Design a protein with these regions (language model features):
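Bacterial N-terminal signal peptides that target proteins for export
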Residues: 1-9
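Bacterial N-terminal signal peptides
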Residues: 9-19
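Sec/Tat signal peptide C-region and signal peptidase I cleavage site
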Residues: 20-26
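Expand to "…catalyze enediolate/carbanion chemistry for C-C bond making/breaking, isomerization
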Residues: 28-308
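General marker for long, soluble alpha-helical cores
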Residues: 301-382
Length: 382
């Protein structure tokens, strides 16, 4: 080995043993230390435009009312959207409606009611499908924990509140491109996120869930809270559960939501109204009632005809409660029947009471609530 080679080896060995001269180290990127930029912030002195009518109702203190759509026909959706609701609750938890069908609804009739949806569960795919296609109200069912609630927040909101993606070519651009202030800049101030408390675990976690930034309302799911508790309306145990959910929302400064038939309970300020099917039946029943009263009093359409005022109400009860597919519609029909019976003759009132008793006997799972609703309306069902 010559002298030059030996010198090189000694130099290399020295570098290994005592370390080579240090270069300036580059710190590893740490996302937690990153400060979010100003690109989407409002200028000093500016406030975000509220273009979502549902959010405007909540900011004004409510009530915010959403009509429910289960059908897949855009004409039916458009009729509901024009009926005066603040938003439309498209049902996708318990229906086989596709996102393509829902997108057609919203593109055809983006208003006057804000487009909304109850998704099937709290995950990125479900919620971003909804928001990317134009939903401005997101209802998420069966939230049992703070972690599940945070998932719903994450996929509903853009950063820095959530983790919603801002990919290009989203369907909502056809609906919301022209909103004042810009969609991306004002979305976090306009979207309404409602989380449904449906189980005992959800009730236990309700107070912590309600405190999460981004949650606008807790929905006390009247049917499933009875399903999971084994109690019904009027039972002390059931009412305590409902009160716990409403109190959790109130203490956190957000809204407590419920079926519209609870509109007389002051703790609730946002509501789910009946389905399009129930509204069609009610509209038809009202029209037929008017015809029956006219023909019965004037003899039109048949001399000497007499009309029973119970007919349309009985038909609605039968349609909604003989084979229950949506509890809220049946309960609403019972409530309407009890109210209608107050102005009927004794014989017609007896017909209504008898039919409700038959339906109570035929639906043991809903019997307690049906009986409670009827009794609260002054209808004797035994």
């Amino acid at each position: 080995m010559n002298t030059k080679t030996l010198a090189i080896l000694i130099t290399l060995l020295t570098c290994v043993l005592i370390g080579a001269p240090a270069h300036d180290a580059v710190a590893q990127f740490n996302a937690a230390d990153f400060e979010y930029g100003d690109r989407f912030k409002m200028a000093d002195g500016e406030t975000p435009e509220i273009w979502n009518p549902a959010m405007r109702k909540l900011l004004d203190g409510g009530p915010m009312i959403g009509g429910t759509v289960r059908a897949t026909d855009p004409r039916t959706y458009c009729a509901m959207a024009a009926a005066g609701y603040d938003f439309i609750w498209v049902e996708m938890q318990h229906e086989a409606t596709t996102w393509e069908q829902v997108s057609r609804f919203w593109k055809t009739c983006p208003g006057p009611a804000a487009p909304g949806v109850r998704v099937a569960y709290a995950d990125e795919r479900e919620i971003q499908h909804a928001t990317d296609m134009g939903a401005a109200v997101i209802v998420v069912p069966t939230i049992d924990s703070v972690e599940e609630a945070q998932e719903a927040v994450n996929w509903t909101y853009f950063p820095p509140i959530g983790r919603r993606s801002a990919g290009g070519g989203q369907g909502m651009s056809e609906i919301w491109n022209e909103v004042p202030g810009g969609y991306r800049q004002t979305w976090n101030d306009n979207v309404v996120l409602i989380l449904m408390i449906e189980t005992l675990e959800g009730v236990e976690a309700a107070r912590e869930i309600a405190k999460l930034p981004g949650v606008d309302g807790l929905f006390a799911a009247s049917g499933d809270l009875g399903n999971f508790s084994g109690f019904g309306e009027g039972d002390a145990e059931y009412e305590a559960i409902i009160t716990e959910v409403a109190t959790a929302a109130k203490d956190a400064g957000i809204h407590a939501c419920a079926p519209l038939r609870w509109a007389d309970r002051p703790e609730f300020t946002c509501f789910q109204a009946a389905t399009e099917g129930a509204n069609i039946r009610r509209g038809a029943a009202a029209e037929l009632q008017q015809a029956a009263e006219r023909f019965g009093s004037s003899g039109g359409g048949g001399a000497g005809r007499t009309a029973s005022s119970a007919g349309p109400t009985l038909a609605n009860l039968t349609a909604e409660c003989s084979s229950i597919t949506y509890e809220a519609d049946c309960f609403s029909a019972v409530e309407s029947a009890a109210e209608a019976a107050t102005s009927m003759s004794d014989s017609d009132k007896a017909l209504i009471g008898r039919r409700v008793r038959e339906l109570i006997a035929a639906n043991p799972s809903q019997a307690s609530q049906m009986r409670s609703i009827a009794s609260a309306g002054g209808l004797d069902v035994g």
